[in-house]
Amino acid sequence: MNRIVSLLILVLLAFTLNAQQFELRELLDGNNPFALRADEFVPKHKFFRWLSADREGARYAAFKNPVKLTFLGFPVLEAILYFENNQLSKLYLSLYNRGDAGEIDYGKFETLVARFNEALSRQTGEKGTEQRGRLANNMVLYANFRVSDDILYTVKWSASGHLKRDMKPQYLQFEMEPFNPKDDPRKQSLVRVDRTKIETSKDLAANVRRKADGTVWIDNIPMVDQGAKGYCVAAVLERILKYYGIDGVNQHTLAQIMKMRSGGVTSEMMLDALDKGGSKFGIKAKNRYSAEIETVEDLSKLISKYNNLARRAKKKKIAQVQKGNIIFVGQTMAQMDPKLFRKLRCDGYSRAMNSFRRDIQSRVNAGLPVGWCVFLGLVNEKQKTLQLAGAHMRLIIGYNAADDSIVYTDTWGSGHEFKTMSLEDAWVMTMRTIYINPRPAR
């Protein structure tokens, strides 16, 4: 009896373990893996989530996911299946990225890259063609392209550093899509985009939509989910690039160029990186407005203005929060009375607020989103947010002049594509606005 019970326990345990693992290759085996249907796949595989309500893609994230996804036996951190006309059009896998997995030894990274390429060669019967390109100083991107049975298999990996002992692995990613001989990546630059593919002004303006209630917004901006890491800046930039027709650059490459850590990066660092390398991506960035606190002097000025207003309103003054040599901006601002800070922003900067309103309307009418850097926690947001306080970056994609509101979107996946708030609330939390414009071929 005890033996039977033990056997049953082992069977149940084996079943449980198997149920918690999924080998993606098995799903894609067959004569035509791109016959996979979106309406059948996601309902059967609940560990994937739609990227957006448009269902242009389904995403798997390993973080806090009970199902462990593998491909050719290698653990997958993130998987995205892209669909067109309800059929699979592209598969993307992140096998390593430092934002999700943290830092690993460079020797281990080299071994991982070699083992994965060997496994893919066995699977496809092709060794592939390897390329390399310079992203920025001490940043080299490598790629291996394999073509087998009219399918393009792309492996990309990169590390940053000058000497081998200093090298920091950045990412290892894989893509699979139908091969198009007229768009062969083996004959193109690995790090510089083809500007003939960038959308024209006329194309972008065609994405503008209008509702009967006066809402004007930009449609067709692809969703990117930053995941649990602080990659909002990189994810916002990836969305803009994809919207402009630039599809070969993702948030991990952008995070590498901006020297981003899992906790994030400042918008100033993004502007600096794009000033140096934006031409490679076919874009140009411009700082339009800034109230961002970047120096001790900036914070001191804000405290002084707030305290002057607090004195007149007979409210409690605030002081800079400092522990040792570290100044805590968030904790300092958390002391402010929300109503008083709103008055400071709206009355003290009314001309800038009016310019903010005009800029949004002008850019949205042209089909151009606004990069929007905010400080969360200053306004009680009515719609779902996954971050309660602190610096964050979003996109403003619309407005309604009738009720003086804006339309915005977050890089948190489905449910965050289309949100609204009053322009006054938006202005209160605004720290910076950035214009990122396309540079199509002439």
Predicted regions mapped to residue ranges:
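Amphipathic alpha-helical segments
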Residues: 21-56, 108-131
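N-terminal signal peptide c-region/cleavage motif recognized by signal peptidases
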Residues: 14-16
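Active-site-adjacent substructure of cysteine-protease-like catalytic cores
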Residues: 309-321, 326-407
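Sec-dependent signal peptide recognition
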Residues: 2-10
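Active-site-adjacent structural segments surrounding the nucleophilic cysteine of cysteine proteases
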Residues: 41, 161-329
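Noncatalytic regulatory segments and standalone regulatory/sensor domains
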Residues: 169-213, 365, 377-388, 397-442
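An acidic-aromatic pocket/loop used at catalytic or ligand-binding sites
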Residues: 70, 75-77, 94-100, 137-193
